[in-house]
Amino acid sequence: MAKTKPILNVAFIGHVDAGKSTTVGRLLLDGGAIDPQLIVRLRKEAEEKGKAGFEFAYVMDGLKEERERGVTIDVAHKKFPTAKYEVTIVDCPGHRDFIKNMITGASQADAAVLVVNVDDAKSGIQPQTREHVFLIRTLGVRQLAVAVNKMDTVNFSEADYNELKKMIGDQLLKMIGFNPEQINFVPVASLHGDNVFKKSERTPWYKGPTIAEVIDGFQPPEKPTNLPLRLPIQDVYSITGVGTVPVGRVETGIIKPGDKVVFEPAGAIGEIKTVEMHHEQLPSAEPGDNIGFNVRGVGKKDIKRGDVLGHTTNPPTVATDFTAQIVVLQHPSVLTVGYTPVFHTHTAQIACTFAEIQKKLNPATGEVLEENPDFLKAGDAAIVKLIPTKPMVIESVKEIPQLGRFAIRDMGMTVAAGMAIQVTAKNK
């Protein structure tokens, strides 16, 4: 079997009107991932609805409601090949109420392409654009490129492109901690395909790469094999003649038969007998592998979903409390000390209490706006101290980022998201 190309997850972010979905649709079409007949059909459908020019976007906007409104709601995943990678595109929604999807989407991204409208040079940077870039930075995405879209509306003017490039660099990227000098800016007209997959003849002044070439230049994610073993449990089975078989995805480190392991917060200790993936035994498993494994000395009743496996020499951290940086996405009123919503981190769902609201931050820059505020509302970013109501494994993002991020849910919606910056470990 031919070795498949490495997979690279790329998030497309930016304001709702910048043309993200059209850019993605064009990449998929010119990259050979979509049947051109589909575009012809969608173009007809778009014109009938008075949305001419939306045909590429329709490829990503799979949901019917999105087509009617022309808005991307859920996180859509599509693939296309470049010279180097099999690229999975995470098309992140642009609307305020959909930032929670952005958080679940961006956390899977290895790199991001920010799509901006060249016209923003006149109207200023959209708040949503700031928020998206801040969020991907917060979520640990370090590789970024900028597609300056709708160049056809300014006759492919180099001056307009340079003006926007300077504004995005000075007023956005530098403030958030990206170095504009190290970021590729690409002038594109996604609807017509200029500089998306193919070089444009209409930008003779631009000598740089196309969007597809920029994506090829991103670095593949390093598998965190050098970090301590962490494997959140998704399910536990008891198989006759085999014994207890937990299943889950290796987040960090390496697991192999013979390893002495501990499940936290359960405290159960055992030894790995076999490791399997897709019904085949493996000599070892690494980050990204979804595995089942047989463990000696641990019964089905001893462990459950939400427990995290690690080596006995470096057990997962059980938090008595933790300090976190959060962004409040939506809440009908305000968050105050004592609020106890459910935290979703790795496979665990555990209620945690807001013990202190230490600082309110500017969500676009991270600077401190207020010490010890009385409350937080939608749109605020903050540093807070949290106390789990039950034992829970969470790691500091500095130590093991894969186990440091969480979403906060209440009333059937994601009210906030964030990451643990300091964890007080329970005494073993």
Curated annotation (Swiss-Prot):
EC number per UniProt: 3.6.5.3
Main subcellular localisation: cytoplasm
Segments of this protein annotated with the region G3: 91-94
Molecular functions (GO terms): GTP binding; GTPase activity; translation elongation factor activity
Keywords: Cytoplasm, Elongation factor, GTP-binding, Hydrolase, Magnesium, Metal-binding, Nucleotide-binding, Protein biosynthesis
Region G1: start-end pairs: 14-21
Lineage: superkingdom: Archaea
Gene Ontology CC annotation, any one: cytoplasm
Residues engaged in binding GTP: 14-21, 91-95, 149-152
Residue ranges of every copy of the tr-type G domain listed in the record: 5-225
Role of this protein: GTP hydrolase that promotes the GTP-dependent binding of aminoacyl-tRNA to the A-site of ribosomes during protein biosynthesis.
Family membership: Belongs to the TRAFAC class translation factor GTPase superfamily. Classic translation factor GTPase family. EF-Tu/EF-1A subfamily.
Name of the molecule in the record: Elongation factor 1-alpha
